[in-house]
């Protein structure tokens, strides 16, 4: 038997269930994309503020570069020769913005989530994770030595019971959640989680703000800023690769946690650092973050418009954010609906198992601030 036969059989099974993934060839045209010769409005991007598609901002940044600062590679890990001064500048700026002791930048959100929990956990650690946390967090949990219990999504009564029954049996308990959940677009009650955490001296709180940074909070710092609990979150994590139109992940935390991660976090230690030119762009965006409030407001308006329409048309839509699922159920039906919307000029993509549970395939509308209300109304007519 050919050693690839099992894999070929599994791929055929995925295709029969309409769950086979393929890489699309995409040409980006600002707010639009061209796929297979058809130009469509992009409703599947994480460019929530529309910054990646905004040419004047890129032009302003590029005009500030000179050959000495345009460094396309760090050529080393940060612990060797890759810790360029721009890293120090970004981490100092993040710490000031969040009013935290320190910050640490990572190569990606995946590196962040897959690396932090294994670094800070041992066999005397219990992780209590929301059932719907991102796959990168699940990978981090699996790589750790900790025991893990996943509580039902946003069910803090169950979480409280787990804390009551387990707090005395472990040296450390880490509650893990996202602030805005990537598939349903709903939110965690961070203040409630802080209240639960504060009842025990051995409980820490880990919050991934990947989908909230840039779009929530008066200064765009996320749901923790919006809910006024930044100071009470031990591991406050975010990414630059979504609303901030750059690359990388970060944590704002105590100096002790930062120093510990530098010494123990394998996905930080054993990787080449980000290129300095990318970090310069990140710093440029962070300096402008406070000026994007009008984009945050516009995103809020169009998100509310589409959410109301989905509910009126009978779709279960738990979202309270700019991520709006239209749950259809069957994978094949979802693919057909996505194809229909694409033929009408909207690049909306199906999300299928294993990304979401069987029977909950959906079209995930990922809105950006440069979409107009008229375009949303045209979309509504088609759904």
Task: Tell where the protein language model's regions lie, with residue ranges.
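N-terminal "arm"/small-domain region of PLP-dependent enzymes with the aminotransferase-like
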Residues: 7-9, 13-72, 203
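PLP-dependent enzyme catalytic core of the Aspartate aminotransferase-like
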Residues: 53-55, 63, 92, 96, ...
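Conserved N-terminal alpha-helix of the aminotransferase class I/II PLP-enzyme fold
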Residues: 59, 63-109, 303
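Conserved PLP-anchoring active-site segment centered on the Schiff-base-forming lysine
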Residues: 116-135, 156
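Active-site phosphate-binding strand-loop segment of PLP-dependent enzymes
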Residues: 149, 153-207
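Active-site PLP attachment segment
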Residues: 219, 225-260
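Structural motif of enzymes handling amino- and sulfur-group chemistry
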Residues: 273-292, 298, 302, 311
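Conserved PLP-binding catalytic core of the aspartate aminotransferase-like
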Residues: 297-304, 311-345, 367-369
